[in-house]
Amino acid sequence: MPLFDLISPKAFVKLVASEKVHRIVPVDATWYLPSWKLDNKVDFLTKPRIPNSIFFDIDAISDKKSPYPHMFPTKKVFDDAMSNLGVQKDDILVVYDRVGNFSSPRCAWTLGVMGHPKVYLLNNFNQYREFKYPLDSSKVAAFSPYPKSHYESSESFQDKEIVDYEEMFQLVKSGELAKKFNAFDARSLGRFEGTEPEPRSDIPSGHIPGTQPLPYGSLLDPETKTYPEAGEAIHATLEKALKDFHCTLDPSKPTICSCGTGVSGVIIKTALELAGVPNVRLYDGSWTEWVLKSGPEWIAENRD
């Protein structure tokens, strides 16, 4: 299971009304692809948001020393950011984004990996607005309505959750990735096969040898962008996606998910875990790091 729980808009509203012990903090984790020409920070400050939300910037809350975008943050970066946002360890965090379930799974996963005790993923903000639940339409000047706190994460599950480049390269070079792992790529089929361009012009399309295409949209409702919440529904959705993209999944093998820069990979990681697939990790650097580090001889096109 994921390190966080799904919560429907209806259940979230009920939780806000009934919770008397812990503070409930909505977390806007909106992030847009650069090609969309949108500004997530401006949207948070000026557009309707769930009341009392904070803004979690996945670009800023990342490894500052890495040349790759929004790599997993160090403990200091994470703790400083949470402190500046006024988050307390006993807060119940409910994460959402304005696209649907796009960048919010990455944020919820990050919070879970860093050991925050209670994290929910709202399934999702589109539905929350559709049901006309409370929104704050006022313009704000800060990314948090709360005073600064002293947040200190006490544990991390990085070893169980993250694959780094060195491990990934050795698995590919030895041939073990294809033989001993399920490895899925969340990008579009065209990007995977090398027939569509990447969002960054300096990055060629293609895929890591030994991976299979599992586009993230195939695991979400095509209209609402929600995860199926019933167990049978998520299994049926996963089975259909695997069949549509001619993928194989052996639950006895460990699984690695990747994407372009480590965002949408968490979408499929979450779906797999909701379906009961154990031992699922994320290759954090994903395709961007792979291309820039490994060289052209390790770029595959079409199907392996």
From Swiss-Prot:
Residues annotated as the enzyme's active site: C259
A GO BP annotation: tRNA wobble uridine modification
Observed phenotype of the null mutant: Leads to a lack of 2-thiouridine for a large fraction of tRNA-Glu, but the small fraction remains 2-thiolated. Increases the amount of sterol esters within the cells.
Region (Disordered): 191-222
Cellular compartment(s): Mitochondrion; Cytoplasm
One GO CC term, this protein: mitochondrion
Domain Rhodanese: 20-137, 177-299
Top-level division of the source organism's lineage: Eukaryota
GO molecular function, a single term: 3-mercaptopyruvate sulfurtransferase activity
Pfam family, one: Rhodanese
Residues found modified as Phosphoserine: S201, S264
EC number: 2.8.1.1
Bias kind Basic and acidic residues: ranges: 191-201
Catalysed reactions listed for this entry: thiosulfate + hydrogen cyanide = thiocyanate + sulfite + 2 H(+)
Broad enzyme group: transferase
Domains as described in the record: Contains two rhodanese domains with different primary structures but with near identical secondary structure conformations suggesting a common evolutionary origin. Only the C-terminal rhodanese domain contains the catalytic cysteine residue.
Note: Present with 5770 molecules/cell in log phase SD medium.
The protein's name: Thiosulfate sulfurtransferase TUM1
